Curated annotation (Swiss-Prot):
Its EC number is 5.6.1.7. One of its GO terms (biological process) is protein refolding. Coiled coil: none annotated. It comes from Rhodopirellula baltica (strain DSM 10527 / NCIMB 13988 / SH1). This is Chaperonin GroEL 1. It holds the Pfam family Cpn60_TCP1. It is an enzyme of class 5 (isomerase).
Amino acid sequence: MAKQIVFDDDARGPLLAGVSKLARAVRSTLGPRGRNAVLDKGWGSPKVTKDGVTVAEDIELDDPFENLGAQLVKEAASKTNDVAGDGTTTATVLSEAIFREGLKMVATGADPMALSRGIQKAVDTAIAQIAKMATPINEKSKSDIKQVATIAGNNDPQIGDVLADAFTKVGKNGVITVEEGRSNETYVDVVEGMQFDRGFLSPHFVTNQDEVTVELDDCYILLFEEKISNNKKMIPLLEAISKAKKPLLIIAEDTEGEALATLVVNKMRGILSACAVKAPGYGDRRKAILGDIAALTGGKAIFKDLGIDLESVKVSDLGRAKQIRITSEATTIVGGAGKKADIEGRVAQIRREIEATDSDYDREKLQERLAKLAGGVAQINVGAATETEMKERKALIDDARAATQAALEEGIVPGGGTALLRCRAAVEKLEKATEGDQKLGVRIIRNVLDQPMRAIANNAGLDGAVVVNRVLQMKGKTEGYDANADKYCDLVAAGIVDPAKVVRTSLTNAASVAALLLTTESLVTEIPVEEEPAGGDHHDHGMGGGMPDMGGMGMGGMGGMGGMGGMGGMM
């Protein structure tokens, strides 16, 4: 496939045009008075959203060079969303502003590489200021969490209430999932203890016939990595547990054949209350989860590489739990008898693995394991009147959840673009201490720190420049403009706050992408191929000169059939 190449200003011009188109579409959604964007999905009903990253991800431009710029900025928005869960619109607005300011400097002869280094220095300074400004929030305070969640949820107090309820129930280490509900109400379901998606292997184990569940109190738990099919190896252990008059849960790769039949018969005869479920996960992940359950219940996971046979397993090797509830689809362990030190050690190990992994999938699975050990699992069931509203609301709550999690991690700063604006003084100080073209790079960041506030004010129907100047004249570090109430006030006291992690990530990713764009000297894309029309009329001789008479097969030639009405005689 042939390629087309452009250089220098011919490359940077289309890049800026593409970035500007994307930023203009996304910018209009910023702030409490931001406007909606309507996205045509090509099927079903159109999607109405105020979520910046959703708008950005839907944009593809015709011009291949412009599209390169748009796609790079889209990546900044997506990365911000992945890391912090919010701040995607801010990242897009800042990317465009930094790139636009940088191009002005390049046009006057500045070295793009020196500009890039200056930009990075200024960003590091601003990030240090954001960290100083950040105030930790109390994870047990429902009102603190509600403030952050309400702002992240587009100033919807119901979203704030629901997320505050979820976080106070499971803590910052808990997992909160957002699912589509089956009613108009939005509510939280909390699963206490450890739950995994494996159900009973036989309906004969059921103890509660009304709810079709197995309920085992003060229960022993056998954790076995391999399949169990030989009942002879299992009988010594079953006899010991039967004497103790306690129920037994077997978690193994599978329990089948004679072994399963023995458990069922003993259960039905009232000799031993038992149940068997398959171990969750596969391969190394299964080993890890069995290790988690062992820590939680104070038992020992019997792995095949330990060389321990089922016959030699003692009652002291088993875990214990106050209550176990098993449905056909899931097992929940509540009140494990594990030592606190062992559980905390396991939690610390999982946290180290989370920090070390580069895989988003692995990180998500590790966080699920962490939640089941350290917190709990809360499911938010989203209710709405229509499917379109449901999808929009679900996306909004999911973003607000991630932003609230970010606030619990790194604290909060004044919202409404104020935190970035308050970094300007420190960046100005750095500018005075920097020389050459790097000084111009620092100046670029100084000039763009007001852009998010300008966009919020413009969307609220005010002059952004006037609002920025008014806020700069205010002496309090937490004072700024509340676009929702249309007033100037102490934003933290009014509950207008942003997670520090969101602000930091937005600026970092925006500067990274803008610096890449500024140091671009050439663009290479495939030459667009114009597609042939799908069908031609009877004058189209595209089939080649060898078959000229095929023109008569055009739709016009079907008139000779006398019209479909003539088929009436066949009825």
